[in-house]
Structures are given as structure tokens and as C-alpha cells.
Amino acid sequence: MESIFHEKQEGSLCAQHCLNNLLQGEYFSPVELSSIAHQLDEEERLRMAEGGVTSEDYRTFLQQPSGNMDDSGFFSIQVISNALKVWGLELILFNSPEYQRLRIDPINERSFICNYKEHWFTVRKLGKQWFNLNSLLTGPELISDTYLALFLAQLQQEGYSIFVVKGDLPDCEADQLLQMIKVQQMHRPKLIGEELAHLKEQSALKADLERVLEAADGPGMFDDDEDDLQRALAMSRQEIDMEDEEADLRRAIQLSMQGSSRGMCEDSPQTSSTDLSSEELRKRREAYFEKQQHQQQEADRPGYLSYPCERPTTSSGGLRSNQAGNAMSEEDVLRATVTVSLETAKDSLKAERKK
């Protein structure tokens, strides 16, 4: 395979690659093919001028671009045909009635030139084997004798024009070498664009793998994962503790409410204190604790006797009413205090969960 000359695609110079792959050497350059195209353009201009240089057809012809070449590097079949005439070679359309009447088996030919739209490539026999020398491939593609006819038929189905190259091709090293040996191809060549895409994909995968390995070898990778896990566990435990505290607080509220309800039913109707402000609750708590402290100090004084006769004389009904009022006030203070504590705990829990 190394001895086979194979030019790969550059720009749109497929006609040049086709000719050089056919002749197995750097026989033509873009400049030489452009010169042939200009000669053809001049010959066409002279033929059009025969009808008169002032005619409408002639002026229209001059305004049109060349049909034999363009700026991209494309060359017409006329350019390729004239270039081959230099070497005594001739092109015949493969599916023309004239050639089909000859009933020649394709494997008995020496080479073909295939064209689809603006792309040209060569299929040539080197030694005793056929090769697809398409410049869009990464290398020559081996074609068996049995597959050659199917390959050409497939190209025709795809819209290709196929030309048979008639004449004696120049001698080349690959043809002489392959007359003595046969080559085997384990892997078929890929299209150049496909190969580039495959190489880019492999390069990207390799780069990703290297980044993963570098990250895995780094000391901070697993430490970061462990820190994240510990933070998640701590937040989970904190939420559970807050839920437990909320449940305990609700049970305390319920018990307090039950005790307050029983005391109220025995003495007087229940009065609501949930509408009290925080400042009023604070003042009531201070008054309650000052009263308790004052009573304790009085009880600790020497000679202090706690007899009912020393208290102001009131009726038994008035005494019960006063005691019930004091009891209600204390119970209301306790219940309101617990309610405020519960609301504060709920607000703290919501703020923590938002974080």
C-alpha cells in the first residue's frame, strides 16, 4: 500500500487529485490545469465570435463566467479530457450505447474516472488488483474483482457519471510491485472528515479521562465529599431535634390548657388572654414574681403570723372570687407565655429550613 501514490483532498482540487492518482505521480498542478481551461475558454470565444462580435449571444457569452473552471479549483470534464490527451489517453462514457455494445467486462479495463456534481476520483487497476483512489479517503481502498461491477453499478445508481480511460498509462512503481505480490487490507480507509471527527472525539475523551484521573488523585476530592455528607447529616439532625422540641412544646401547651380549663370551670368563666401584647405579658409576669417574692419575705420575718383574722374582713364569696381571679390571671399568663414561645420556635424553624 505504501508504494501507491494517493493525493488527499485539498480545497476543491479534486480534478487535479483525480488525474495525479490515475497517472500515479505529480503530473499536473492547478496552474497547468488553469492554463488548459483558459485555452478552452478562448476556443469557445472564437467560435462564438464567428456569429458576429456585436451579436447578443456573443455579448452574453462574454458576461458569463468560465464553464471550464472556477475560483474554488473545480475543472470541467473538457479540462480533464484535454489533460489526458497529452499522455495519449481518451475518455469514453461507461454507460454510453457505443461502449455497452462492446460488452467489455469491467475487470478487463485498466481504469475509470468517476464524477458526481463537482467531485472527481479515480478507480484504477494496479498489478492484478483494483483500488479506489478517491481523494476524500484517508488511503487507497482495495476492491475485489467480484465487487468491482457491483461498485460501479452502485455509483451509477447514486448519480455518478463513469468514464473508461482508454490507452496506455505511464509505468509506475506500484504497478510493477503489485504484479508480483498481492496486498491484503485488514481495515478499510475512512472518509477524511469522518477520520478527523473520530480523532477529535478520541482527543476529547482522552482529555476528559485525564481530568477525571487528576481529580481522583487530588487530596481534596474525597475530603470535600465527606464534608458535604457531614453537613447534610448535621442539618438533618437539627431538623429532627427542632421537630421533637415542637412536639414537646405542643404537649406542654395541651396540658396547660387542660389544667386551666378545669380551674376556670370550677371558679369562673374562662377569659381569653391570647390577645395580650408582649409588653403586657412581661408586666404581668414581673408583677406576679414580685408578689411571690414579697410574700416570701413577709413569711420569713420574725413574729409573722398568718391567721385569717389578720386579713381584711370579707365575705366567703368575695374571698373565693378574689382567689379565682388571681388563679385565672396566673394561668392566663402561663398560657400566653407558652403560646409566644411556640410562635417564636416556629419562626426560627422556618428560617432555618430556608437556609
UniProtKB/Swiss-Prot annotation:
Methyltransferase is among the record's keywords: no
Pfam families, alphabetized: Josephin (PF02099), SUIM_assoc (PF16619), UIM (PF02809)
Glycyl lysine isopeptide (Lys-Gly) (interchain with G-Cter in ubiquitin) cross-link, renumbered residues: 200
Keywords recorded for this protein, A-Z: Hydrolase, Isopeptide bond, Lysosome, Membrane, Nucleus, Phosphoprotein, Protease, Repeat, Thiol protease, Transcription, Transcription regulation, Ubl conjugation, Ubl conjugation pathway
Bias type Polar residues, positions: 312-326
GO cellular component, one term: nuclear matrix
Record PTM text: Monoubiquitinated by UBE2W, possibly leading to activate the deubiquitinating enzyme activity.
Role: Deubiquitinating enzyme involved in protein homeostasis maintenance, transcription, cytoskeleton regulation, myogenesis and degradation of misfolded chaperone substrates. Binds long polyubiquitin chains and trims them, while it has weak or no activity against chains of 4 or less ubiquitins. Involved in degradation of misfolded chaperone substrates via its interaction with STUB1/CHIP: recruited to monoubiquitinated STUB1/CHIP, and restricts the length of ubiquitin chain attached to STUB1/CHIP substrates and preventing further chain extension.
Protein's name according to its UniProt entry: Ataxin-3
